[in-house]
């Protein structure tokens, strides 16, 4: 019986790599997969999922207006789909998460979603909120902070490397960069206004 999966993590935990490996595992057995990624994120080129270790795969794009259930139903009528995989699933709307649950429940196609749980403010993305609520299986993909603890938070740094937690939730292609850290060092960095100073102190412990 098909299920809806949500693989979630902080940034740079290998979500895209895990998605590409799952897709490959299906294809290796002669099964057909359909891969989606968010139209909003084209850092590695539009229409593909790319991992930091150099793997990539063509992908369909979704935006807030994409009717995922109708697209997948039409596609599966033409040719059997054995699995749907969604990268950057934090950018899904509530309705799209519901549509993916319909793909599972009505079309009996497994759906594997990969995404961030929280944003740089420590708040849930809408897509992640409903995936956490409605998925059959939740899997945390772990990465570590510079201190060795599990990294569960994402810091946004400005062009001068200073952490901040105000502004738009989604900024693609700006001068900002993001770093995954543990909760303690997320709070410490925001309080001090510097991640570098905290990292330097930690090196000398």
UniProtKB/Swiss-Prot annotation:
Q: Oligomeric state and partners?
A: Homotetramer.
Question: What Enzyme Commission number does this protein have?
Answer: 2.7.1.21
Q: What class of enzyme is it?
A: transferase
Biological process annotations from GO: DNA biosynthetic process; thymidine metabolic process
What is the organism of origin for this protein? Salmonella typhimurium (strain LT2 / SGSC1412 / ATCC 700720)
Family of this protein? Belongs to the thymidine kinase family.
- Which key words tag this protein in UniProt? ATP-binding, Cytoplasm, DNA synthesis, Kinase, Metal-binding, Nucleotide-binding, Transferase, Zinc
Q: Which HAMAP family match?
A: Thymidine_kinase
Q: What is the lineage of its organism?
A: Bacteria, Pseudomonadati, Pseudomonadota, Gammaproteobacteria, Enterobacterales
Q: What protein is this chain from? A: Thymidine kinase
* An MF annotation (GO) of this entry: zinc ion binding
* Localization (cell): Cytoplasm
Protein residues bound to ATP: 9-16, 87-90
Matching entries from InterPro entries are given as: P-loop_NTPase (IPR027417), Thymidine_kinase (IPR001267), Thymidine_kinase_CS (IPR020633)
Q: List, from the UniProt record, the residues annotated as the active site of this protein.
A: 88
Q: Which reaction does it catalyse?
A: thymidine + ATP = dTMP + ADP + H(+)
> Listed GO cellular component terms?
cytosol
Tell me the residue numbers annotated for binding Zn(2+).
145, 147, 182, 185
